[in-house]
Amino acid sequence: MTFITDLETELRQNSNEELAIPMENYMKNKFSFLGIQTENRRTILKTNWHKHKEEVQTNFRSICWELFNKKEREFHQCAIDILMKEIKKKYLP
């Protein structure tokens, strides 16, 4: 899946260790973080989503599962964003 590899590459390139440590402490060290703030994470997700729109629409469930299986919390949050938007588009009036 090229969407996941592109998203992972861009998120890892924009990681910030200085922000990751306080984020992990805030969540009581239950999750690892890349240190990407919400606004930046959403813009990265949005640009990659537009590049791979058809792939995301057809495989959103498997993409979300794969993102949830990654260690860092930012991937989990991207999966939640994808799931919410795709479910609203497909199943809600």
Regions found by a protein language model. Name each.
Residues 1-93:
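Surface-facing alpha-helical segments and adjacent helix-coil boundary elements at the starts of domains
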